[in-house]
């Protein structure tokens, strides 16, 4: 009987150690800090995380450009940083790229 109790306790400890603490979880953009948005996680279904705005060369979604977005964002990427545009490249993907129309040369 005593051996069964020890096994039960060991099983409880083993299952309790397989957990993770997730920081930066959010529901909407207003819960995130400056320079971030609340985007869907690629790794955990149903989880949204405060994610940095897109930097030059990073993938983006052309329909995801408003900050703060008042509802739940449906994309895993944030809009591009303010000085960048979400542009389509020859390979068909969208990436953050400098807005050359507004550049000061």
UniProtKB/Swiss-Prot annotation:
Its subcellular locations are: Secreted
Q: Which GO terms describe its molecular function?
A: G protein-coupled receptor binding; growth factor activity
Q: Could you say which residues form the signal peptide?
A: 1-19
Query: In what tissue types does this protein appear?
Result: Highly expressed in liver and ovary and weakly expressed in testis and placenta. Expressed in mucosa and mesenchyme of embryonic gut during enteric nervous system development (at protein level). Predominantly expressed in kidney and liver. Also expressed in lung, ovary, placenta and testis. In fetal liver, is restricted to and highly expressed in hepatocytes. In adult kidney, expression is restricted to the endothelial tubule cells. In placenta, expressed throughout gestation.
**What's the protein name?**
Prokineticin-1
Q: Which PANTHER family match?
A: PROKINETICIN (PTHR18821), PROKINETICIN-1 (PTHR18821:SF7)
Q: Name one GO biological process term.
A: regulation of angiogenesis
Swiss-Prot/TrEMBL keywords: Angiogenesis, Disulfide bond, Growth factor, Mitogen, Secreted, Signal
An annotated GO cellular component of this protein is:
extracellular region
Disulfide connectivity for this sequence is: 26-38, 32-50, 37-78, 60-86, 80-96
The entry's function note states:
Potently contracts gastrointestinal (GI) smooth muscle. Induces proliferation, migration and fenestration (the formation of membrane discontinuities) in capillary endothelial cells. Induces proliferation and differentiation, but not migration, of enteric neural crest cells. Directly influences neuroblastoma progression by promoting the proliferation and migration of neuroblastoma cells. Positively regulates PTGS2 expression and prostaglandin synthesis. May play a role in placentation. May play a role in normal and pathological testis angiogenesis.
Q: Does the keyword Transferase apply?
A: no
The organism encoding this protein is Mus musculus (Mouse)
